[in-house]
A protein has these predicted regions:
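Generic beta-strand or strand-like secondary-structure segments
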Residues: 66-70, 84, 103-110
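Glycine/proline-rich, positively charged
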Residues: 93-119
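A short, structured active-site edge motif that brings together acidic residues
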Residues: 77-91
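A short acidic, helix-capping loop that chelates divalent metal ions and anchors anionic groups
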Residues: 22-27, 88-94
Length: 119
């Protein structure tokens, strides 16, 4: 694996995106096949991928939860997580900055809670 220095952190150039995870046959967009996803995460980690990217709206909000569970058995210092604030989807431009900041903070806290399984 090739790595890059990102502000002193060693990140794999290849990341694991979670916008399109495998689904359970016949299921809906939030019905992620957790076993197959865990196998994919294990394969990625075994081959040096250490950067995982997810976001609030992926798979109806389930992407963060499933990736969090797939990574729970790995040393937390061995990988990097990115989740994103979907401001364009949950913001209202009529709100002032304080409301936007509160919404952003809430979305980030929610994402990290789903990724870690902790509230």
């Amino acid at each position: 694996m090739i790595y890059t220095d990102f502000y002193g952190e060693k990140l794999s150039l290849l990341g694991f995106g979670t916008m399109r995870l495998p689904l359970v046959p016949g299921g809906g967009p939030a019905d992620i096949d957790e076993k197959t996803t865990a196998d994919m995460v294990r394969y990625a980690m075994d081959h040096g991928v250490n950067y995982f990217d997810t976001a609030y709206p992926y798979h109806g909000g389930m992407s963060e939860r499933v990736i969090g569970r797939a990574l729970k058995d790995y040393d937390r210092q061995s990988f990097y997580l990115a989740t994103k604030y979907p401001g364009h989807q949950i913001s209202d431009s009529r709100f002032h900055f304080a409301s936007e900041w509160t919404t952003c903070a809430s979305a980030c806290t929610s994402g990290m809670s789903k990724l870690t399984g902790r509230s």
